[in-house]
């Protein structure tokens, strides 16, 4: 099981990393060809997809489907799975019809709310209509994708994701070279997503057929159990979504497409890094579900402890480097257009930095409703802090006040979120505080030195950027390995090597 987890994690890292790079490459192409306003309009329409703002309303269909299939691989009751997936499928279709109808009928009102100018109204409305139609496929696809994740077939998911992203980027570059209208970019993106969803559907049917699972009428007990999980996930997604994917929509309400384009460009790199780490841990959900089904509490605890200490060890240095070197990154990536806002791009990295301590706990405790409810409550506190800070600074910083609110809210609530996970994992307080404290000190001191160094060295190429950031990360990793990790943590590395056949077993 652990070997499969490592294998799936590597697949997710490589495939989504490549797809993320392609996605970042295409943003300056869109902005330079069609403008920030047009880019903002494209972003607004993507918010209405399950991968965007609408994710807060998806009832956790993908996560619940993953848990259902993963648990079935332990208890082997595939008839029960058939009933459960039947209910989730019907629920997803009803949700898709409701979402699509709301988008189609609400298109005229959305153009007014987003302050779309007369020159773009008709084309923007057409994109909204096609987005509504695409959701009829993309919302049920959440169940299909969750099913494939439950079988831990991450190679298929990531390959299809990379292929669809590559097709989108290539066709967008082509549209740029032939001076096509900006709405073509939106249509290319929708087509790529729908084709990928159909490929995942084929994989879902194949996997379920192999196990002999058949769709069947569900029982009242099945319906109540699944609805309870869905509503609990909905609560967390609603709260988390307001401080995440809904923010570009809020920027559009106050500042129009230009504000959306500016906001999205400033937070895109930090958001991609956050999603990338989320995908690294997405392979954990089926494993955690199977461990919970088995009652393997010791392994479950060990998994959570490694996530709280070792994941930040690897992921925080690149994020800190991205924050400190934001002026250089923004200049090379977008150009001089948004260079004056580099400070805000750096501030946006605070959000994924805070998330690193929570991401694995948030995933594995999807199987523990009590802990999840506590985390949801803390998210609501974070939301209140975000709203207060953003409202107080909206007149000073425009759309950038949303970034400030997120950063402050994340920092204020983080200690309580970490403590909730520590208590749930029964970790000893003193040793845990020591590990996190030393880790924070290393990163603060290292980031300060990097900031001074960046003011003296001209970082004006990707090679120089990679060398400076890479050196910083390497020094940070070595320092944390020596000063933060205990012997039992370090033992994980040779164990993984043995498991993957990369190191000989000791006698």
Predicted segments, located by residue:
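Interhelical loop/hinge segments that connect adjacent transmembrane helices in multipass membrane
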Residues: 1-5, 182, 186, 200-245, ...
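N-terminal membrane topogenesis motif
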Residues: 1-24, 32, 62, 79-87, ...
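Membrane-proximal transmembrane or re-entrant/amphipathic helices at the cytosolic face
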Residues: 423, 427-429, 451-507
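Helix-loop junctions and terminal segments of transmembrane helices
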Residues: 58-75, 150, 208-213, 266, ...
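Interfacial segments at transmembrane-helix termini and the short loops linking adjacent helices
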Residues: 107-131, 313, 322-354, 425
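Short runs within selected transmembrane alpha-helices of multi-pass transporters and secretion channels
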Residues: 15, 19-23, 27, 46-51, ...
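Interfacial/gating helices of multi-pass transporter permease domains
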Residues: 30-53, 84, 182-187, 222-233, ...
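Membrane-water interface segments that mark the loop-to-transmembrane alpha-helix transition
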Residues: 4-19, 58-112, 126-132, 297-318, ...
């Amino acid at each position: 099981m652990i070997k499969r987890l490592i294998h799936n994690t590597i697949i997710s890292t490589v495939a989504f990393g490549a797809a993320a790079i392609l996605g970042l490459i295409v943003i300056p192409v869109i902005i330079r060809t069609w403008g920030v306003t047009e880019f903002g309009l494209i972003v607004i329409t993507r918010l209405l997809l399950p991968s965007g703002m609408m994710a807060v309303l998806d009832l956790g269909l993908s996560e619940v489907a993953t848990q259902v299939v993963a648990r079935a691989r332990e208890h082997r009751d595939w008839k029960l799975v058939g009933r459960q997936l039947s209910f989730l499928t019907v629920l997803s279709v009803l949700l898709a019809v409701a979402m699509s109808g709301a988008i189609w009928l609400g298109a005229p009102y959305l153009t007014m709310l987003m302050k779309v100018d007369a020159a773009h109204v008709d084309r923007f409305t057409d994109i909204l209509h096609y987005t509504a139609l695409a959701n009829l496929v993309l919302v049920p696809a959440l169940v299909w994708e969750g099913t494939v994740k439950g079988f831990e077939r991450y190679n298929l998911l990531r390959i299809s994701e990379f292929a669809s992203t590559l097709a989108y980027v290539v066709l967008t570059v082509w549209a740029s070279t032939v001076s096509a209208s900006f709405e073509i970019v939106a249509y290319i993106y929708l087509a790529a997503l729908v084709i990928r969803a159909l490929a995942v559907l084929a994989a879902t049917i194949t996997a379920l057929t192999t196990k002999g699972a058949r769709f069947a009428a569900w029982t009242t007990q099945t319906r109540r159990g699944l609805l309870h999980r869905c509503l609990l996930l909905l609560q967390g997604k609603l709260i988390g979504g307001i401080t995440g994917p809904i923010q570009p929509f809020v920027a559009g309400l106050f500042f129009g497409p230009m504000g959306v384009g500016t906001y999205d460009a400033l937070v895109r790199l930090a958001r991609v890094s956050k999603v990338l780490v989320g995908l690294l841990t997405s392979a954990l959900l089926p494993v955690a579900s199977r461990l919970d089904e088995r009652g393997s509490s010791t392994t479950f605890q060990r998994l959570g402890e490694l996530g709280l200490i070792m994941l930040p060890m690897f992921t925080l240095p690149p994020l800190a480097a991205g924050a400190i070197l934001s002026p250089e990154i923004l200049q090379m990536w977008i150009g001089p257009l948004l260079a004056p806002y580099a400070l805000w791009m750096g501030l946006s990295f605070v959000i994924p930095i805070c998330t690193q301590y929570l991401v694995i706990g948030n995933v594995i405790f999807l199987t523990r409703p009590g802990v999840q409810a506590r985390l949801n409550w803390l998210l609501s506190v974070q939301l209140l802090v975000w709203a207060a800070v953003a409202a107080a600074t909206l007149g000073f910083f425009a759309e950038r006040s949303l970034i400030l609110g997120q950063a402050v809210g994340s920092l204020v609530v983080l200690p309580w979120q970490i403590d909730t996970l520590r208590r749930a994992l029964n970790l000893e307080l003193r040793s845990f505080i020591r590990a996190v404290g030393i880790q924070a000190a290393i990163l603060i001191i290292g980031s300060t030195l990097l900031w001074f160094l960046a003011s003296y060295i001209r970082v004006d190429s990707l090679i120089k950027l990679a060398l400076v950031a890479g050196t910083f990360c390497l020094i940070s990793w070595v320092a944390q390995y020596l000063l933060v990790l205990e012997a039992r943590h370090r033992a994980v590395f040779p164990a993984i090597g043995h498991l993957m056949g990369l190191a000989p077993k000791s006698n």
